[in-house]
Amino acid sequence: MEVKEVVVIVKWSGKEYPVDLTDQDTVEVLRHEIFRKTQVRPERQKLLNLKYKGKTAADNVKISALELKPNFKLMMVGSTEADIEDACSLPDNIGEVVDDFDDADEREESVEHSAVYLAKVQRRVRDYKIKELAPPREGKKLLVLDIDYTLFDHRSPAETGTELMRPYLHEFLTSAYEDYDIVIWSATSMRWIEEKMRLLGVASNDNYKVMFYLDSTAMISVHVPERGVVDVKPLGVIWALYKQYNSSNTIMFDDIRRNFLMNPKSGLKIRPFRQAHLNRGTDTELLKLSDYLRKIAHHCPDFNSLNHRKWEHYHPKKNS
């Protein structure tokens, strides 16, 4: 199936926002991408001139069926939550509530090999600009790390960033750096990633180096039955730009399993670090994971053979 790229120009609040899609995406995906650009939630968007057979296009209609002209300009009306005084605020952990896929192997497989989503990955490879902070090192494996709730409790109040840092963070990164090049990938803006890395002392630590940061714009949106549209972190973006890394030598940590949908075998769901003030004294997750990373780096030549859901039970003699 040939997948064609489509650009829709959304006109809203006096500005224009280009939205990159494929012709196999649906109106629901379009709304999700508009939300990423404008922060106007899909249910609040009124797409004035998006028609299908003379009527307002339903969410399940494919972009290809709309027969849009190149650089079609879409008129939108809608308000952000911040602009609606009586709007109910969303729960802080709404993402974590709805996005676990613990029993979703078939769904993962269908997403991973979808031509539509692979085309989106290729677009990220083409358009995303990586700012390299440290060069890759020969013979090293790749560790990709989330930030929020993985390395850092970003919701609890504190005087300093170190109060919210997951215990043993610097020891973990120092140990991992012996065998892995390290990449930070967060579903936030680059400005916030850089600020958090500065606050945590990661950016300035002499014992290890982060190769580069990836932000939310390197992610892609996928449609999952019964879940709707979600954003995921496709490792193919990194693998295409750095050929020495692939599924055999890459592992990614995140507290949200849906981020692994494009690369389910490469992801390890870490226990989220919340309520830092209560859990700082007992959280040893990073210490245990340091041991796991070291063992698989030294004893497992192909990470595809691993089941990261059972990482706590890995024994080199039995698994290598």
UniProtKB/Swiss-Prot annotation:
It holds the Pfam family NIF. Mg(2+) binds at residues 146, 148, 255. InterPro entries: FCP1_dom, HAD-like_sf, HAD-SF_hydro_IIID, HAD_sf, Ubiquitin-like_dom, Ubiquitin-like_domsf, UBLCP1. GO terms for molecular function: metal ion binding; protein serine/threonine phosphatase activity. Residues 6-77 form the Ubiquitin-like domain. GO terms for cellular component: nucleus. Dephosphorylates 26S nuclear proteasomes, thereby decreasing their proteolytic activity. Recruited to the 19S regulatory particle of the 26S proteasome where it dephosphorylates 19S component Rpt1 which impairs Rpt1 ATPase activity and disrupts 26S proteasome assembly. It catalyses: O-phospho-L-seryl-[protein] + H2O = L-seryl-[protein] + phosphate; O-phospho-L-threonyl-[protein] + H2O = L-threonyl-[protein] + phosphate. It is found in: Nucleus. Its EC number is 3.1.3.16. GO terms for biological process: regulation of proteasome assembly. Transmembrane segments: none annotated. Keywords: Hydrolase, Magnesium, Metal-binding, Nucleus, Protein phosphatase. Its cofactor is Mg(2+). Gene3D superfamilies: HAD superfamily/HAD-like (3.40.50.1000), Phosphatidylinositol 3-kinase Catalytic Subunit, Chain A, domain 1 (3.10.20.90). The gene is Ublcp1. Residues 136-296 form the FCP1 homology domain. This is Ubiquitin-like domain-containing CTD phosphatase 1. CDD domains: Ubl_UBLCP1 (cd01813).
